[in-house]
């Protein structure tokens, strides 16, 4: 493992570092959640290989070495979605209203999109966007398999989306591209490609995405900002930018089992493999306040989307 990364994590975790290092040598955990739109259930699954998730309804951990749920016919029918446990916690940290207009900015492969859109009614709208054409194709497949009728997949640069969705969304999910430190146990490539230069490059990209998200968020709208990395540059430093420069209000996230507070910040969430059944994750909730300085018209979806 990269020595600089080790030094940074030792400074961050202090006495918890040995437990964290040990957890990196253990096998990752897999999980899934049921599709409420198709009345998914575990009735016809082998419950011997399943463990109920402690705080997410209709979600389960499973023994992937002995039970290949990704090859089960129910998966191809969209009765459940397989998602990494910590990533599943992101969209679960906020309650969505049935008629919310929601944007998932960097949505592929679609776990957060499907989880959220299944909670919306026909009065709500989910725009699931990914700038990468190949990943947007995978996103479309997962949205179709899940049976979402209130979801539109776009393949666009968020800067372009700003022109059509200014002050439009009630809630935005920004699971930002990151240096992937939280995936070291799961992906060898994340370990091999890590560098401090990559951390700084990702932080720059994230800042631009945050600015786009702010423009597209309604007054009093809420942004879920998340990454699967540990660096302060990509997490708490970005939150400071949003609260100080953009004057957004940082909301406190209710801590669930396995969630830790952020670095010198009790309102955000950090997740580590030695504390929960999942990989690394950072989550923050922020509300936009413009004090009436920004006016907007909540356009009907088809009037806006026809220009994309």
Describe the function of each predicted region.
Residues 1-168, 200-205, 249-271:
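Glycine-rich nucleotide cofactor-binding entry segment
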Residues 273-275, 280-292:
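Core SAM-dependent methyltransferase catalytic element
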Residues 117, 207, 211-214:
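A structural alpha-helix within SAM-dependent methyltransferase catalytic domains
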Residues 297-307:
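Conserved small/polar residues in nucleotide/adenosyl-binding loops
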Residues 236-254:
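Conserved Class I S-adenosyl-L-methionine
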Residues 121, 217-218:
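Helix-to-beta-strand junctions that scaffold the AdoMet/dcAdoMet cofactor pocket
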Residues 134, 174-209, 224, 228-235:
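Mobile active-site "lid"/loop adjacent to the S-adenosyl-L-methionine
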């Amino acid at each position: 493992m990269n020595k600089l990364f080790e030094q940074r994590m030792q400074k961050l975790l202090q006495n918890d570092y040995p437990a964290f290092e040990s957890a990196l040598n253990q096998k990752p955990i897999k999980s899934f959640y049921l599709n409420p739109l198709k009345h998914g259930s575990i009735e016809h699954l082998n419950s011997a290989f399943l463990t109920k998730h402690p705080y997410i309804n209709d979600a389960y951990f499973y023994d992937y070495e002995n039970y290949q749920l990704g090859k089960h016919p129910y998966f191809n029918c969209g009765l459940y979605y397989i998602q990494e446990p910590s990533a599943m916690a992101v969209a679960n940290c906020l309650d969505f209203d049935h008629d919310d207009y929601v944007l998932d900015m960097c949505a592929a492969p679609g776990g957060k999109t499907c989880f959220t859109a299944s909670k919306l009614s026909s009065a709500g709208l989910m725009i699931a966007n990914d700038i990468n054409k190949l990943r947007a194709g995978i996103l479309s497949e997962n949205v179709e398999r899940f049976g979402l009728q209130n979801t539109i997949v776009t393949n666009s640069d968020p800067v372009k989306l700003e022109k059509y969705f200014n002050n439009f969304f009630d809630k935005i999910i920004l699971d930002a591209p990151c240096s992937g430190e939280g995936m070291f146990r799961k992906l060898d490539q994340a370990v091999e490609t890590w560098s401090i230069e990559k951390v700084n490059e990702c932080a720059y990209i994230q800042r631009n995405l945050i600015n786009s998200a702010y423009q597209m968020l309604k007054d009093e709208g809420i942004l879920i900002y998340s990454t699967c990395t540990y660096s302060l540059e990509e997490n708490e430093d970005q939150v400071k930018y949003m609260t100080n420069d953009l004057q957004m209000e940082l909301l406190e996230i209710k801590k669930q089992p396995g969630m830790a507070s952020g670095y010198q910040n009790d309102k955000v969430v950090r997740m580590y493999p030695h504390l929960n059944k999942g990989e690394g994750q950072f989550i923050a909730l922020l509300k936009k306040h413009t004090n009436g300085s920004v006016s907007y018209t909540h356009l009907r979806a088809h009037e806006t989307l026809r220009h994309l």
